[in-house]
């Protein structure tokens, strides 16, 4: 059983973007131009771009992005194995980012010395 009716959700997202486009056409037009410009590059094919988009989508926790880019990745011929590998990279990088930020937390803790400063003090 699926967590969500992704096809219906993708249609709902498209309808929502259509509504935003009516209210702020330049914003949506700018987004569309940015997306179109990216699609014109020749360094990566559509499948790789869509797998990258999905890796970013899970990092940003964007269900709409997942719905749209999963459909596009499938159209571009992505396999479940390729999807797993791309998402594995995102999982690894996100875990790595948490690890790096953990070092900043320890730095903050140590920099405060024996006793934390009072509120409003540095």
Predicted regions mapped to residue ranges:
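C-terminal structural segments of small proteins and small subunits
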Residues: 84-109
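Short, thiol/selenol-centered motifs that function as redox-active sites or metal-ligating centers
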Residues: 52, 56-68
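Alpha-helical scaffolds flanking conserved acidic
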Residues: 46-51, 80-86
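Alpha-helix C-capping/helix-to-loop hinge sites
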Residues: 37-41, 55, 90-93
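Acidic, glycine/proline-rich low-complexity segments that act as flexible tails and inter-domain linkers
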Residues: 1-48, 101-122
